[in-house]
């Protein structure tokens, strides 16, 4: 710890630190070596000044290096490229599970989706809460998850299963009761290291910085979005987008109408607990969900299909997602994944 003291001193003086220095600090955290008081001081110092691109990237580097390894997928999967559909959470709205449901649709439409998720942060039902309702084994072995990705086009990676070291920060984060750098790290530390990302953030001020971070982390293509209060592509208002493509970042707004969708009220997307949200997801994936639910999922799946190269525009992606939902293929995929996650046919638990 003593050799890191000069880094702490610079933080306390309001100075920025490098990507490598931040990586060193966060490596201490995930190895359980950092004093909780020092950890709190570090996180608050960064928060008060505002975390830099290098600092967020360095923290992600440390957590990815410490994570349980995800086995290399097949050559076909690597050639096509992997996409994640993920949000920071913490937007304060308790909506249905849009990004999780969208993952099934994007995969059923042809994308290779490795979704990294956790239990709920702000809503009554997070990604893993929902999946457990469908009998999807969240603690499946990494080899089983890899086989699901190769064979079915979809796997879910439960964050605590891969990032055990993050538990060392939990007491400090709970005691601070405020957002810190950890609140934006979750979407950045997918152990499958996706090539493409649709990433929703809880604050419009984060859209550009997080896109810069994805570029620094060598993500090939991405859309970072904030949809009128939600960490999703919105159907109730405009979505602010920063798109990363071929090393360039462009910023624009996307409306529901531009995607060929009707505008809904945000109240139409209200979620409930895991059991109720599971029934909502089941209805959507079977092709008879409520219009606002179906279109919200199609918008997000459609943008994921676009960013992963399956379609030439978000509009085309959304149309393909709607066709996929109407066919019921996404629900069949859910059933296949539940079966595969619990069986030894694709790997060992």
UniProtKB/Swiss-Prot annotation:
One of its GO terms (molecular function) is magnesium ion binding. GO terms for cellular component: cytosol. Anthranilate 2 binds at residue 173. It catalyses: N-(5-phospho-beta-D-ribosyl)anthranilate + diphosphate = 5-phospho-alpha-D-ribose 1-diphosphate + anthranilate. SUPFAM superfamilies: Nucleoside phosphorylase/phosphoribosyltransferase catalytic domain, Nucleoside phosphorylase/phosphoribosyltransferase N-terminal domain. Its cofactor is Mg(2+). Binds 2 magnesium ions per monomer. InterPro entries: Anthranilate_Pribosyl_Tfrase, Glycosyl_Trfase_fam3, Glycosyl_Trfase_fam3_N_dom, Glycosyl_Trfase_fam3_N_dom_sf, Nuc_phospho_transferase. The keyword Cell cycle does not apply. Pathway: Amino-acid biosynthesis; L-tryptophan biosynthesis; L-tryptophan from chorismate: step 2/5. Anthranilate 1 binds at residues 87, 118. Coiled coil: none annotated. Mg(2+) 2 binds at residues 231-232. Keywords: Amino-acid biosynthesis, Aromatic amino acid biosynthesis, Glycosyltransferase, Magnesium, Metal-binding, Transferase, Tryptophan biosynthesis. Mg(2+) 1 binds at residues 99, 232. GO terms for biological process: L-tryptophan biosynthetic process. Catalyzes the transfer of the phosphoribosyl group of 5-phosphorylribose-1-pyrophosphate (PRPP) to anthranilate to yield N-(5'-phosphoribosyl)-anthranilate (PRA). Homodimer. This is Anthranilate phosphoribosyltransferase. It comes from Shewanella loihica (strain ATCC BAA-1088 / PV-4). The gene is trpD.
């Amino acid at each position: 710890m003593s050799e890191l003291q000069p880094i702490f001193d610079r933080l306390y003086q309001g100075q920025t630190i490098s990507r490598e220095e931040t990586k060193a600090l966060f490596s201490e955290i995930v190895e359980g070596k950092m004093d909780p008081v020092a950890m709190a001081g570090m996180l608050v110092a960064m928060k008060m000044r505002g975390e830099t691109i290098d600092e967020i990237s360095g923290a992600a580097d440390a957590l990815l290096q410490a994570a349980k390894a995800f086995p290399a997928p097949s050559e076909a999967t690597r050639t096509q490229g992997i996409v994640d559909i993920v949000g920071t959470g913490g937007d304060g709205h308790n909506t249905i599970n849009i990004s999780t449901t969208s993952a099934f649709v994007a995969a059923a439409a042809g994308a290779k989706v490795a979704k990294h998720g956790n239990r709920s942060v702000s809503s009554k039902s997070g990604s893993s809460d929902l999946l457990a309702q469908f009998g999807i084994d969240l603690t499946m072995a990494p080899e089983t998850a890899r086989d699901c990705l190769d064979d079915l086009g979809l796997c879910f990676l439960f964050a605590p299963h891969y990032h055990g070291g993050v538990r060392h920060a939990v007491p400090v984060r709970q005691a601070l009761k405020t957002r810190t750098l950890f609140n934006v790290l979750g979407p950045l530390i997918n152990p499958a290291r996706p090539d493409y990302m649709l990433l929703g953030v809880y604050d419009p001020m984060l859209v550009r910085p997080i896109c810069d971070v994805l570029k620094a982390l060598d993500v090939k293509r991405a859309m970072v979005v904030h949809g009128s209060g939600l960490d999703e592509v919105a159907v109730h208002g405009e979505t602010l987008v920063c798109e990363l493509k071929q090393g360039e970042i462009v910023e624009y707004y996307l409306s529901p109408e531009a995607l060929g969708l009707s505008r809904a009220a945000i109240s139409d997307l209200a979620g409930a607990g895991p059991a109720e949200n599971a029934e909502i997801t089941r209805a959507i994936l079977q092709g008879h969900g409520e219009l606002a639910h179906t279109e919200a999922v199609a918008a997000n799946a459609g943008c994921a299909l676009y960013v992963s190269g399956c379609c030439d525009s978000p509009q085309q992606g959304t149309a393909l997602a709607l066709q996929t939902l109407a066919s019921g293929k996404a629900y069949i995929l859910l059933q296949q994944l539940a079966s595969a996650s619990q069986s030894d046919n694709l790997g060992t638990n």
